[in-house]
Amino acid sequence: MALVVGLVGLSLHQPAGEAGSLSILMEPDATGVWRDLFDRFEQQNPGLGVQFVEGPPATNAREDMYSTAFLAGRGGFDVVYADVVWVPKFAAAGWLMDLTDRISVEDRQDFLPADLQGSTYRGRLYRIPALTDAGLLYYRKDLVAQPPATFADLIARAKEHQSPDRWGFVWQGKQYEGLVTCFLEIVWGHGGEWIDAETREVRLDEPAAVDALQFMVDLIGDLSPPGTSTYTEEETRTIFRSGRAVFLRNWLYVWGLMDQDGTIGRSQVGFAPMVHAPGKDSASTLGGWGFAVSRLTKDPDAAWRLVEFLTRPESLAQVRDRMGRVSARQSQVPADLLPVLLKARPRPPIPEYAQASDILQRWLSAALTRRAAPAEALSRAASETRLLLNVD
């Protein structure tokens, strides 16, 4: 049976799993599905055990735990359960094994293209996708027959159905990573960009980005609640599920919870990609999780076997059924959701992502709370980001 380890007494400076044992740090296993999968892996691999460390719920806290273990130089974990935005940092630091030649052609063809792209750094694959995520525009289809395609459509329909008891559009405006993902979808919809993935060019002070932020600022207090600059995912979901909003920007998990609570159910709700400007394309910000192999593991072949096992279709089907999560395999994605996921885009694949995101969050928040004009905020953010990336 897989050994489940709590954080109390755990040393992150211990070597990666000893012979016959593989260690992995993950989120709390509320449903027990991961424990069951680890038990099955052990049954299929006699003599090989899994030490499962249940970490804190917060993603950044687990990233810090992995980073601390790697920086100690002895790599406390053999397998890394990695957020898509960790890949560039971890790969650039030399913490992950190159898996390019280990993945099969069949698996490469089955995984969603954006999830594979987000698992790649400088042309090499360092993570095998498992669970995907993407931003969606949810709408009340009992009020709106067809989802809006453009920003003008969104504004018009939100105004049409807004009332004293119902806001037009709710989204995540607090100073945190969720604000960055919302901003990116609106920037992409305007034809703009944050940081060019190939050249590392910072494009925050271009007109498309300024127009995107101005759009967000103008929403607050008009079609979006005055408290938007304090909202995360759950605040906005609560407003929408109670029937107090026409449109909601949020992640895939909202769909899984739609019939479990609140007054609004799936029969009254539809979803679509975020809207775009005329002549531009919509895109959803990619999220999601996958598995990587530590370069410090004592048994890379065994660690790879665990990664391969956890990302098999049958394993991911169990996670889908018990957690309500969406598999990163195209063959397992619901047909109505696939078109949205095929338009998902990763965030900039740079090792300095966390620092760049912090800069952007601070200045986006300054604009949303009217402490700085959008053009000024993005000019300052662009300057700080260029200094961080050492680019002109």
Walk through the language-model features, giving the residues of each.
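Extracytoplasmic "Venus flytrap"/periplasmic binding protein-like
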Residues: 40, 44-111, 120, 149, ...
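Conserved C-terminal helix/tail region of periplasmic/extracytoplasmic solute-binding proteins
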Residues: 1-10, 340-392
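Glycine-centered hinge/linker elements that transmit conformational signals in sensory
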Residues: 157-162, 198-230, 274
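Short, well-ordered beta-strand elements
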Residues: 19-29, 48-54, 78-79, 126, ...
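Hinge/lid segment of periplasmic solute-binding proteins
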Residues: 84-136, 146-149, 153-157, 163, ...
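Extracytoplasmic/periplasmic solute-binding protein
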Residues: 124-130, 135, 153-202, 208, ...
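C-terminal lobe and pocket-closing loops
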Residues: 253-266, 277-363
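Short, solvent-exposed loop/beta-turn-alpha elements that line the ligand-binding surface or hinge
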Residues: 100-111, 173-174, 192-211, 260-263, ...
